Amino acid sequence: MNLRLELTRFLNLCFALASAFMFWKGLSIVTNSHSPIVVVLSGSMEPAFQRGDILFLWNRNELNKVGDVVVYEVDNKEIPIVHRVLREHVDETSGKQLLLTKGDNNAGNDIPLYAKRKIYLHKEKDIVGTVKGYIPQLGYITIWISENKYAKMGLMGLIALSALLSNE
């Protein structure tokens, strides 16, 4: 085993991982969103967005309008929610924008999804970003990998095997 070759492979892997991380962080800074790309996980926004669509977010707009599709996070829930702004207003005391949302495919608004005793989302605190573009169905790959433990193990095995067999 050539130590220099193995060290070069390891450093190339570290460089690739660091580059991907820097790209993600750079995109986060440009979009002002800690998660600038998300995958739709449910059918609550059909027909506008299907399960598996990849959404690109932007969070530099000052105010959201009724009809905007936003991604928001709720306290104590890990998965962000993609829904449309149903109603908006500015709180007179704080000057902050408050939003009420609803999934296009849902019967009622999202108040039951919000934290206890909360009837509006705070733009600055709860909104991850506004949807500015999407790629249909490409996110199914991530859904399939996350929901299928054998797919995870197979992918990890494939990565390990390719690292072991590479002759560069």
Curated annotation (Swiss-Prot):
UniProt GO MF annotations: serine-type endopeptidase activity
Reactions this protein catalyses: Cleavage of hydrophobic, N-terminal signal or leader sequences from secreted and periplasmic proteins
Cytoplasmic topological domain residue ranges: 1-12
BP term (GO), one: signal peptide processing
EC category: hydrolase
Residues at the catalytic site: 44, 83, 110
Residues in compartment: Lumenal: 31-168
InterPro entries assigned: LexA/Signal_pep-like_sf, Pept_S26A_signal_pept_1_Ser-AS, Peptidase_S26B
EC annotation from Swiss-Prot or TrEMBL: 3.4.21.89
Topology term for the membrane: Single-pass type II membrane protein
CC annotations in GO: signal peptidase complex
Ranges that cross the membrane: 13-30
Region feature (C-terminal short (CTS) helix): 154-165
Entry similarity comment: Belongs to the peptidase S26B family.
General function of this protein: Catalytic component of the signal peptidase complex (SPC) which catalyzes the cleavage of N-terminal signal sequences from nascent proteins as they are translocated into the lumen of the endoplasmic reticulum. Specifically cleaves N-terminal signal peptides that contain a hydrophobic alpha-helix (h-region) shorter than 18-20 amino acids.
Subunit structure: Component of the signal peptidase complex (SPC) composed of a catalytic subunit SEC11 and three accessory subunits SPC1, SPC2 and SPC3. The complex induces a local thinning of the ER membrane which is used to measure the length of the signal peptide (SP) h-region of protein substrates. This ensures the selectivity of the complex towards h-regions shorter than 18-20 amino acids. SPC associates with the translocon complex.
Protein name: Signal peptidase complex catalytic subunit SEC11
Organism, scientific name: Lachancea thermotolerans (strain ATCC 56472 / CBS 6340 / NRRL Y-8284)
Gene designation: SEC11
